[in-house]
């Protein structure tokens, strides 16, 4: 390892302990997107945060009081927001990729890439109603 690489490499003993908490999507239509994620993936609103210029809906799987969350963030002034190009998909582990793909499409998602087999997994992509890419994954044993 070069001196420069050694100097910039993170030190395990000083790195903070972290856990993943949430992904936040800024959305155009908060009510519509809430309905989509409820119907397509069974998420429920665990908490609503009313801010001066926006509302946040903290969504989780039904019955979960803690853990990873999807936060939908809607501006109150209905400003124009769009999905940019510098992002990757939100990955969702599912039991049956084909069934989850069909269900999401039936609930308003756009098919983006039909289910296929990859090494050790089955994968498909859909776009939510505002164009965000969602990757559906089922690991094979």
Where are these regions (language model features)?
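Vicinal oxygen chelate
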Residues: 1-16, 22, 46-48, 92, ...
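Core segments of cupin and vicinal oxygen chelate
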Residues: 17-18, 24-67
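Eukaryotic phosphotyrosine signaling hubs
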Residues: 20-21, 85-89
């Amino acid at each position: 390892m070069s001196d420069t690489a050694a100097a910039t490499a993170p030190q395990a003993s000083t790195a903070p302990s972290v856990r993943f908490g949430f992904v936040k999507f800024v959305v155009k239509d908060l009510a519509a997107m809430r309905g989509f994620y409820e119907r397509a993936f069974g998420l429920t609103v665990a908490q609503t945060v009313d801010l001066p210029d926006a509302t946040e809906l903290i969504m989780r799987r039904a019955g979960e009081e803690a853990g990873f969350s999807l936060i939908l963030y809607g501006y109150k002034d209905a400003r124009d927001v769009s999905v940019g190009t510098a992002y990757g998909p939100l990955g969702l582990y599912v039991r049956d990729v084909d069934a989850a793909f069909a269900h999401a499409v039936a609930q308003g998602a756009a098919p983006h890439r039909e289910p296929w087999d990859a090494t050790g997994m089955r994968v498909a992509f859909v776009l939510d109603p505002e164009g965000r890419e969602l990757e559906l994954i089922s690991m094979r044993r």
